[in-house]
Amino acid sequence: MKKILMTLGCLLIVITLTACGEKATESQETQESNEPLNLYGTWTQTNSNSATSYQEAIISEDGTITINWINEEDDSKALYWAGSFEAPTTSDDTYSWTSTNDKEQTETALLASGDDTKDFKYENGVISYEASALGSTMTIELERK
């Protein structure tokens, strides 16, 4: 009889611990999935027509996005966009925002956009926006570096 009670006691402990473990995991997954989408960091153009010339964006926690033209051949960069960034507040996997141009930074940059605002979209790991230069417009696609 003692063996049966001991076996039932052990079984009850195992079931209790297993149930507790599952609840903690579910709670942890829920917490992780509720964190807002994080777009901070460095993003690099993936659809450039050149392997050595492309755009690179830095999204900072101070609420700014800076985009530079990068030219690896002569190791140079030139400002294209400096503007505002509104961080996502939800965990949705798509996001869009309108950035306001920081004209103090862009007005003296030769290759900078003169637009007052620029629309950005994040979807499936890609940030996209339209860029115009020399009368040609292209949708730029960036992926996290």
Question: Whereabouts are the PLM-identified features?
Answer:
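Bacterial signal peptide processing site
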Residues: G21-K23
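Sec-dependent N-terminal signal peptides
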Residues: M6-I13
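Positively charged n-region of N-terminal signal peptides that target proteins for export
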Residues: M1-I4
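Contiguous, well-ordered beta-strand patches that form the walls/edges
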Residues: N49-S53, E72-V126, A133, M138
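Short, solvent-exposed coil/turn segments at beta-strand boundaries
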Residues: L39, A57-I65, T90-S91, F120-I127, ...
